[in-house]
């Protein structure tokens, strides 16, 4: 690169190096209170100048024109120091019906910045989640997945899109909302209202898809800080640092099936409700839908086999991944297996104990 191209490259990399570097500057504060971390983030954000043409690595389709310098927020992590910040992003308008309309639109976009985490694993998980989404869409199966963007910007550094208008179960607990059903009623109205029923449907459809994905990929660390609920009532799983053959602390303590707590089932209407029956039916359909694509999904994961990602334990990892599709089962046997997964997951004691451990160690609340 030479001339203006070289200058543009240097401006862009200098910009997100400074922003991402704030996460690194927080390391001495890892054991400090959130207000102390927040003050440090604000101090560092005030130093950052926005130069012309720079963009967020996870959103190259728009230019950053400003920063909300008081938006920095430290995020929950036992050993790392991720933080979230908000930027004003200017995007070109593709089609203007009126020539007097402005050629661009400004939107506020939040992103999470990490140092000390290998985001390649998140990128892999989300790439595979996008594969699952395409499979389900191709057959017209009404389930929901949100493969948001993650970009590894350097070894051990990355930028992660924030799910818009979403709240984690952890944040609900800290706001003294101790029941997931209460959250849905407070946000969408009475249980018999149209808005609540639509949110419940969105919840069920997304729970079914993520349940299958979490089982197939053996996604771990499913505490309440890693489960989000968007503005339409969908569940969205985030943070894929533990999958396949690893779990937090080197153990695989959580359920083999997936997380399905009592309060999640309560949002569906209860264990004996039509909502739960729909959930179980969608889990079976989603599981059967992805089985013919087992080789493609395994092949995508196999691209990372030669890396040093901790989730891979050699070819055996891929063999176990392929086995979870139950390739030797008939369609009926596979459907019964999916039903067994739902039965195993419901109120699984391992999931409850993991939530208890997270509450004791990291102060992440859950409903008892």
For each of these PLM feature ranges, what is it?
Residues 1-209, 224, 229-368:
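ATP-dependent kinase catalytic cores of phosphoinositide-metabolizing enzymes
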Residues 218, 223-224:
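Canonical protein kinase catalytic loop motif
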């Amino acid at each position: 690169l030479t001339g203006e191209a070289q200058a543009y490259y240097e401006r862009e990399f200098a910009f997100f190096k400074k922003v991402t570097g704030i996460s690194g500057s927080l390391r001495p504060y890892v054991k400090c209170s959130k207000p102390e971390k927040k003050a440090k983030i604000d101090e560092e954000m005030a130093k950052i100048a926005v130069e012309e043409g720079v963009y967020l690595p996870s959103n190259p389709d728009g230019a950053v024109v400003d920063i909300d310098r008081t938006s920095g927020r430290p995020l929950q992590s036992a050993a790392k120091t991720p933080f979230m910040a908000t930027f004003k992003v200017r995007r070109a308008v593709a089609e203007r019906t009126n020539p007097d309309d402005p050629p661009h639109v400004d939107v506020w976009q939040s992103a999470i910045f990490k140092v000390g985490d290998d985001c390649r694993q998140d990128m892999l998980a989300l790439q595979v989640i996008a594969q699952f989404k395409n499979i389900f869409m191709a057959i017209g199966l009404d389930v929901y997945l949100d493969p948001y963007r993650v970009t590894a910007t350097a070894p051990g550094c990355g930028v992660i899109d924030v799910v818009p208008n979403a709240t984690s179960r952890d944040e609900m607990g800290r706001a003294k909302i101790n029941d997931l059903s209460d959250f849905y009623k407070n946000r969408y109205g009475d249980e018999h209202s149209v808005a609540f029923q639509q949110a419940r449907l969105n919840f069920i459809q997304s729970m079914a898809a993520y349940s299958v994905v979490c089982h197939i990929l053996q996604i771990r660390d499913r505490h309440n800080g890693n489960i989000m609920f968007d503005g339409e009532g969908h569940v969205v799983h985030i943070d894929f640092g533990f999958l396949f053959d690893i779990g937090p602390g080197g153990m695989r303590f959580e359920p083999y099936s997936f997380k399905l707590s009592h309060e999640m089932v309560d949002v569906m209407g209860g264990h004996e409700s039509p909502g739960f029956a729909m959930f179980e039916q969608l889990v079976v359909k989603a599981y059967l839908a992805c089985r013919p694509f087992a080789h493609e999904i395994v092949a995508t994961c196999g691209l990372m086999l030669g890396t040093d990602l901790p989730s891979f334990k050699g070819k055996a990892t891929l063999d176990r991944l392929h086995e979870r599709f139950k390739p030797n089962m008939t369609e009926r046997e596979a459907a019964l297996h999916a039903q067994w997964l739902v039965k195993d997951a419901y109120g699984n004691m391992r999931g409850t104990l993991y939530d208890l451990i997270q509450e004791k160690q990291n102060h992440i609340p859950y409903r008892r």
